[in-house]
Amino acid sequence: MGGIDSDVNEHLRKRASLIATENALRFDSGAITNATENEKRAVEIVENLRMCGAKEIWNASEGVLMHPGMDFLTAKEIIMQVNTGLYKIMKQLPKGGLLRGHLNTMCDVKFIYNLALEYPAIHIRVNSKVTPNAPLPMPEFKPLPPNLIMQYAGTPLLTCANYVPGTWISLQKARNGFLYGGPEGFDKWILGSATLGAGAGTKNYAALTKANGICYAEIRTNFSYKMDIREDGSETLSHRDYLILFDEAIQEIKDRMRSEGRDDEFVGAKLIYCVFRTFNKEKLRWYLEDCMALKAEFPNLIAGFDFLGPERRGHPLEYYIEPLVWFKQETKNRGLDIPFVFLVGEPMSSEDKSDSNLYDALLLGAKRIGHGLNLAKHPLLMQMAKERGVAVEVCTISSELLGLTSPIHHPLTTLLNYGVPVVLCPDNPASYGYAGLSFDFFQAMVCSTSSNLLSLKQLAKQSIQYSCLNAEEMKNAYEAWEKRWSVFVDTIVSGRFEPPNIDGKQI
């Protein structure tokens, strides 16, 4: 028996050693190893909330079949109604930076709509008759210049029999004269029709807002149009003018927060210069020059470069290799730092022709890639991303609602377990009825029993680490985040939670 006992003990020793070695490879091993006593206590509290919340959610509604990986829009309402404890903590959690979000889908739709109502230049049109017996059509919005405002001043109301589909009418006039429910019925229609692209006409009136727990943002902005629309509806706003307005808006937010004693909560925001991937190579050259000129004049505002549009449509990165290699060398010659942050690896199928974009993105030295869904099917490319520190902008909710993958098949846990840098991003949150990152962090928390509060801590820190902040800005961001994290942990341990602010649409 002595020999058997010795062998058993040796097996158990090796087993413990193997588990410890594997745990040391976890992406959050540093956060776990260096956890303070307060953090350890907070982890226990949050884990208890998760377990209790899970039981409540599975028994939440007799009319809804609850299951792992269920669709977000259904689960979202149940989370907000039932799992208020864990959800409340996710709202308060300091999330660091928001590194993937499109400007026209970052703000609350209701906020943008109310803002649009204040401007007489904003007009609306529909492409079919508006009748009480048919589904209401999708509206289109656009700010018109003074001459066109006069031209369309006599347009009949949308609900009138003599309205000609496709004709512009003042948004204010259309709302005030809406026959099917009055202004309230009009509001319900407009807000209910808000989807990807539905707010295109009001996108340039969107105000930058600070989501809970987010101290910094890199916002993808469409620079494809050489002139944009001013407040009076005229298309005379240059890219340079736009950056001046953006800079003023950021400074206004900082000044207001400083006056409230909250200046350490918001580091700032930058723009990722984006253009359509349908442009030819010659046309792209103009935009690459423009991007460099703007970076030279506004070094603290331009963060990186990317293409817009679904990866399957338009040109692959291979088509743009010549201008992109030139751009990379030219930025170096001019002393400019404009990293590539490409949308690649979007389709889950490795047989999709756009899947090859992963190869070009890594060879071009991309700083980040997103959605990166297919990266997990390329072991060599995963290893390259890990070794080179190329972060994946993971958008679990957006990937589901865009039909790219189901929640239960999302490769987030695979990427984390393999050690590939990951940052959580919302992508198009306002299109899905929420804002900020709270739901994205909630999903990361509940997607695996091995995830805990310290896992989220590491993900938040990575959003600063893999941002386009310069060294000084990154230092300030880390310091501000650490301060907020300490307060956050104390709040959990002491039980001092503020009541959740849930209205069914906003976080």
Predicted features, each with a name:
Residues 2-507:
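Metal-cofactor-binding active-site regions of metalloenzymes
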